[in-house]
A protein has these predicted regions:
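Ligand-binding pockets and gating/stacking loops
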Residues: 2-478
Length: 478
């Protein structure tokens, strides 16, 4: 006769942590309510604000792969003049050695490639936007373009790590984790950092991880890259093998064991674990409602392009970002799959990709503005690097970390403004250069945080997001 295994009731705290953790334990540990943690550690509370914030939260729209700036937001008439010709290039001596070598290689192996798309000025600000982004043009006067971005790393792994963690080769906390650590959450029932379909490659979890910061500051993830957002769930929030009522009874027993253990040891981490499970229980009631978009109006669904292709999936991500933002999550990371890396087939690839995200992003900006959320929400659109003005092969562009564009919108941002510039061919940042560290410093500044003062002691030194670099780009502030 087959023996009945695991029949005995688990009676140790460790055993309960294991069995109950299959349902909500993992979420509980890293989605700990920062308001509760602040009671034991004041560095996690809003008392760390160094000045009056303009933004309460951030939505970071990450275009994974490298969007071409000269085909999107940075028109260069010289590309047409020199199309198919060698690049008459000067100015490489101003760049660091790695970038200089990379650009010299591009110059030797490729000829100038003109853009396929037409650029026009839009809005009262006269912002230049190509017809690759027709829906975004409606928001020209709400956007602030930084056209002089540059970063470290010529490979995706390095550059993706830079945009998300501020370091291209070492394990460091992600930007969202630093925001969670510095500000906590506006809603004690939700984590401070949520990543919707996070990037899987080029560093994967490090791009939304907490590294040496307390583990509860890493992102709570919703789905994964390549999965349909409509099917996305928060992992470990519910144990599919037991009913919710049974799970609640497990939690009650676990809490009794934890409290007994706490009275014997009086360790603050045990108390934090107790409270984290309570927060996980609250998430069980709130998170499913946030993920369920069935109550959204038809007008909202049409605004985002939710019920049509090819916009449906990214529209779902942007709509979830608005819902989590509205509910009090501090930092939303919304990523595309790794689709923007057109070393060949640039026109086909960029057209397909822009069609899938242009309307949803436009819808998000409109929705935030209509609800009054854009006044205290910072929206960041970014990509790990740009692309070269010379061709790779016949119809592609190579990586270009020396000069590219990001844009900002919302809280505290000078709307309808373009900052900085690249050279005549869009190859490298030339005027009012902005490094990735500067962008990070500016984001923290808008949240009320001095990037030089937000530090964490680890391995004998004080670490910060911007390391020993970074300056706030004051020109882009309202």
């Amino acid at each position: 006769m087959k023996q009945c295994e695991n029949f005995s009731i688990p009676h140790t705290r460790r055993h309960w942590l294991h069995t109950a953790g299959c349902g909500f334990g993992a979420v509980a540990f890293h989605a700990l309510s920062q308001q509760i943690a602040a009671a034991a550690d004041p560095t996690l509370s809003t008392q760390t604000l160094h000045h009056t914030p303009k933004a309460k939260r951030v939505i970071f729209l990450f275009m994974h792969g490298g969007v071409s700036q000269v085909d999107s937001f940075d028109p260069k008439p010289m590309l047409k003049q020199y199309d198919g010709k060698d690049l008459p290039f000067k100015g490489l001596d101003t760049l660091d050695i790695a970038l200089k070598d990379k650009l010299k290689e591009n110059k030797r192996n490729g000829r100038v490639l003109d853009t396929t798309w037409n650029f026009q000025q839009h809005g009262e600000s006269g912002a230049w936007i190509s017809d690759l982004w027709p829906h975004l043009t409606k928001h020209a006067d709400d956007l602030c373009f930084i056209k002089s971005m540059h970063t470290r790393g010529t490979s995706h792994g390095q550059a993706v790590a830079m945009i998300h963690t501020g370091n291209d080769n070492l394990l460091r906390p992600s930007l969202g984790s630093w925001v969670s650590y510095g500000l906590g959450t506006e809603n004690e029932n939700l984590p401070g950092f949520v990543s919707i379909t996070p990037p899987a490659g080029h560093g994967g979890a490090r791009n939304y991880g907490s590294a040496f910061l307390p583990a509860h500051h890493q992102a709570t993830t919703l789905g994964h890259s390549g999965s349909k957002t409509a099917d996305a769930t928060i992992r470990f929030l519910k144990n599919p093998t037991v009913e919710l009522s049974e799970q609640q009874r497990q939690l009650q027993m676990l809490q009794q064991l934890n409290r007994k253990h706490f009275t014997q040891n009086q360790h603050p981490q045990i108390d934090a674990v107790i409270r984290s499970y309570e927060m996980a229980f609250r998430m069980q009631n709130l998170a499913p409602d946030l993920i369920d978009i069935s109550n959204e109006s038809m007008a909202t669904r049409e605004l985002y392009g939710l019920d049509q292709e090819p916009t449906s999936d990214f529209a779902h991500r942007c709509l979830l970002a608005r819902r989590f933002c509205e509910a009090g999550v501090r930092y939303l990371q919304v990523s595309t799959p790794y689709v923007w890396d057109q070393h060949g087939g640039l026109v086909k690839g960029h057209t397909k990709n822009a069609l899938s995200v242009d309307q949803p992003i436009s819808g998000l900006l409109t929705d935030l503005k209509q609800r009054g959320l854009l006044e205290d929400t910072l929206v960041v659109w970014g990509t790990e690097f740009g692309r070269t003005p010379v061709a790779q092969g016949t119809d592609g562009r190579d990586h270009n970390p020396a000069g590219f564009t990001v844009w900002l919108s919302g809280a505290g941002i000078k709307a309808g403004y373009s900052h900085g510039s690249t050279d005549d061919f869009g190859y490298y940042a030339q005027e009012n250069k902005v490094h990735m560290h500067d962008l990070h410093a500016t984001i923290l500044h808008l949240l009320g945080i001095d990037h030089e003062k937000l530090t964490y002691r680890y391995a004998g030194r004080d670490f910060r997001l911007t390391d020993v670099y970074g300056e706030v780009v004051k020109q882009v502030l309202a």
